[in-house]
Amino acid sequence: MSEVVTSAANPVVKRMRMLASRKIRQREGVSLAEGIQPVWQAVEAGAPVEALIFAPDLLRYQPAVEMVLEAERRGVRVVRLSGELFQRLSDRDGAAGLAAIVGQRLTPLRELPAEPGTTFVALHEIASPGNLGTVIRTADAAGARAVILVGATADPYDPAAIKASMGAIFSVPVARAAGSDEFFAWADERDLAVVTTSARAEQSVWEARYPDPLVVLMGSEGPGLPDADLRRGRLQVSIPMTGTAESLNLAVATGVVLYEVVRQRRARGQD
């Protein structure tokens, strides 16, 4: 068993701090996941774990302790930190005492298969890592095949995105499209129907009949999708607002559309 690290000068501790930088994450192709659920998901999904970091005096959840020890027996590097040092490094109050340095895995867009019954989620220039992570978690829950990031989008491996995804980032394939032209060319080549949301749409999310296979394209909460992208989509739907709110959070809106797609497919006996 390795000794407990107490010094901030330790190379692993320095590396954890450096991974707060998007530039360094992208250069080295690794990210930092913190928390029991994200780390557990990374290990279960077979993500390339460079190191597991845990504080023996903070990590109280015994199944997680056993998972760490089992990974160590399999040859995964395990670094033990003092609780005080882990707390100083943590971005959250009441740190659970578990983190991991994990390799990033982006799937080339051309490798995503579009089979019958497939649903994708595409996000156009989403700036918030938290929103991005929550949508990835929602896509995972609704059975989407992959999430496609279109244009200048937040880093899916930002610690805030990993945290919001609850580790789904390690299970759901994520691909990038440089811009709308590349995205629509990919969708057209695979005969994927692009579904968008707009308050001006003639059909509500419940009235529309969804094509198969499809990709749900969502814009950022502020400006939404560019008009040109709305026009290029095959189907526009609205999400009726019956209260005083004018709009929904991005992840909630995405979930409403995805689960209506799931409901209709099940009603048709496709799932």
List each language-model region with its residue ranges:
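Structured adenosyl-cofactor binding patch, chiefly the S-adenosyl-L-methionine
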Residues: 100, 138-142, 156-169, 227-271
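Active-site/ligand-binding-proximal alpha/beta "capping" segment
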Residues: 195-245, 249
